[in-house]
Amino acid sequence: MNIWNNAVITNKGLALQSKLMEGHSLEITRAIAGSGYVTPDLLQNQTDVIDAQQELIFRPVSYPEYGKCKLPLYLTNEDVTVGYKVRMIYVMANDPDEGEIVFFVAQSARSDMGTIVPTASEMAGYSAEWTFYFQYGRADGVNVTVDPANTVSRNEMETYVGEEFVAISTPEIDSIFES
């Protein structure tokens, strides 16, 4: 099991937070899985992504309580041709003065740990999900663009699952359960 106990808002992220106090909204632009590793004391100084592997998919953001933003991130191995180990997760944000910055970074507890991502041919359909919580005075001011191509509605899922159950309900299978 991987432990992600090294998680910080970077120095540039803290500077952006002070701008949020002036009325700007936090605009999270993307999230990236990386295989790099730094001494935990250096995480707050991160300005670049180390050994980027792939962009993560945003799941719908929610606000479980006032001032708290829940940000789920999702990864699939659909296009992975060389397996790797996720040791760092970067959340990027738009700074009104500097453009895109490393806002937040989380790192596995040790360099030999991480989430293993196999290739699509090794394990088709593999996925992983991480959820991060950010607490602010105005968490409802966080803007994240969620790509609707990566989500399904409850109705769509129920229809799909129902069709799959019908597809596997053949007379041969039914006769096994009747015996």
Which sequence ranges carry the predicted segments?
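A signal for long, low-complexity, Ser/Thr/Asn-enriched, surface-exposed stalk/shaft
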Residues: V152-S179
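N-terminal assembly/attachment segments of tailed bacteriophage virion structural proteins
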Residues: M1-P148, D174-E178
